[in-house]
Regions:
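Short, polar/flexible loop-turn hinges at active-site or ligand-entry regions and domain interfaces
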Residues: 49-50, 139-143, 222
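N-terminal Rossmann-like or analogous alpha/beta NTP/dinucleotide-binding catalytic cores
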Residues: 2-130, 282
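Conserved nucleotide- and phosphate/pyrophosphate-binding catalytic cores
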Residues: 148, 154-319
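Internal, conserved structured core segments that host functional sites
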Residues: 106-160, 164
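Short catalytic-loop micro-motif centered on adjacent basic/acidic residues
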Residues: 75-78, 141, 219
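A generic secondary-structure signal for well-formed alpha-helical elements
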Residues: 61, 68, 96-99, 137, ...
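Short helix-capping/linker segments at secondary-structure and domain boundaries
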Residues: 98-102, 134-141, 240-248, 278
Length: 319
């Protein structure tokens, strides 16, 4: 089963990114043919700062590798290192009705949030379709807000296949209903947009500050506490097995500990869980040439597949 996912280099990763998506990708490496790329072309729709994009791309590569992405098990590359995706993007554009793109929810949402209404943003789903179809992707893991983009890729693929024969594999969106929705420090869904994150690779000082900002109720220290509705508990249980969760629940129900104690405990859990990943992340960032070698290794494998696919398409077009 060939699975593909693209990840934008949009800044620091938080534990919501990890438990909501990255952990599932790492686990999937053992049973699927994983294709993962850092979507730096896509990131240009929100920022055209070249130096920032370059640094964020390297940080993203270091982050994913340190969290368990294995370049020997997965094909892992930088989107812009496989130029064929832009060639396919242009070909697919000829098969994409304007009305199909005008119905895209994400375009309207992003413009409403202040992003410039550029052609790049408008045609974002066509580039995403090129990412998917270039590699004969079967499964695309997505959040519910991205299902429509995979459906657009299918629509375009069907149109091309009707014209030229079975050129493209029809992809399917996979929404994992069991994926954790991680609450942020304010109790809403954890998101950079809400400024309520607990970042994985932040300094210990910043981590402590973020955890200290978790919103709690005013229950007195000596009184029993409601673990089910406590944001600290909701986050802590992600790091605990069943027995660990039960032990923490008992501490809540017993009373005698304040929320400050539970925040300190959560701080210890997060630090311990990501200790090795942080060390590896910092080591990788100190060796940008090594990071580039890893990305080049993946790009070479991805490019070979992409070139074979494009050769078939060139023959159909007459190029």
């Amino acid at each position: 089963m060939r699975v593909l996912t693209g990840l934008q280099p949009s800044g620091d990763l938080h534990i919501g990114n990890y438990f909501g998506a990255i952990k599932q990708m790492v686990d999937a490496q053992e049973k699927s043919q994983m294709f993962m790329f850092i979507a730096n072309y896509h990131a240009m729709t929100s920022s055209q700062d070249g130096e920032k994009l370059k640094q964020n791309s390297l940080k993203a590569a270091a982050a994913f590798l340190s969290l368990g992405i294995d370049p020997q098990k997965s094909v892992f590359w930088l989107q812009s290192d496989v130029k064929e995706v832009m060639e396919l993007y242009w070909v697919l554009s000829q098969f994409t009705p304007m009305g199909l793109l005008e119905r895209a929810h994400s375009y309207k949402d992003k413009v409403a949030k202040g992003l410039s209404a550029s052609h790049g943003l408008f045609s974002y789903p066509v580039l995403m379709a090129a990412d998917i179809l270039l590699f004969d992707t079967q499964i695309v893991p997505v959040g519910k807000d991205q299902i429509q983009h995979v459906e657009i890729a299918r629509d375009i693929a069907l149109k091309v296949n009707n014209e030229w024969g079975e050129i493209f594999t029809l992809p399917e969106a996979k929404v994992n209903e069991e994926v954790a929705v991680v609450v942020g420090t304010d109790g809403a869904k954890m998101s950079k947009s809400y400024q309520n994150t607990i970042d994985i690779f932040s300094s210990e000082k910043t981590l402590k500050k973020q955890i200290s900002s978790i919103v709690t109720d005013s229950t007195a220290l000596e009184d029993p506490k409601d673990h089910e509705n406590c944001n600290i508990f909701k986050i802590a249980k992600l790091f605990l097995d069943e027995s660990g969760q039960k032990e923490l629940q008992i501490r809540y129900e017993k009373g005698g500990e304040g929320y400050g104690h539970f925040k300190m405990y959560l701080n210890e859990l997060v630090n311990a869980y990501f200790k090795e990943a942080r060390e590896k992340y910092n080591e990788l960032l100190e060796k940008p040439s090594h990071l580039k070698e890893i990305l080049d290794f993946g790009a070479t494998k991805a490019r070979k597949i992409a070139q074979e696919k494009m050769q078939k398409i060139y023959e159909k077009i007459g190029l």
